[in-house]
Amino acid sequence: MKVRASVKKICDKCKVIHREGVVRVICTNPKHKQRQG
């Protein structure tokens, strides 16, 4: 899980979702997991 100021899709399988007011990126590749913080 990377915590970043700006979250972006890294590959085609990445999805940007809003969960409880937090922007997250979920992907099949665990290295691509990100959270805005």
Swiss-Prot record:
One of its GO terms (cellular component) is ribosome. The keyword Oxidoreductase does not apply. InterPro entries: Ribosomal_bL36, Ribosomal_bL36_sp. Signal peptide: none annotated. GO terms for molecular function: structural constituent of ribosome. It comes from the Bacteria. GO terms for biological process: translation. Keywords: Ribonucleoprotein, Ribosomal protein. Belongs to the bacterial ribosomal protein bL36 family. PANTHER family: 50S RIBOSOMAL PROTEIN L36, CHLOROPLASTIC (PTHR42888), LARGE RIBOSOMAL SUBUNIT PROTEIN BL36C (PTHR42888:SF1). This is Large ribosomal subunit protein bL36. It comes from Solibacter usitatus (strain Ellin6076). The lineage of its organism: Bacteria, Pseudomonadati, Acidobacteriota, Terriglobia, Bryobacterales. The gene is rpmJ.
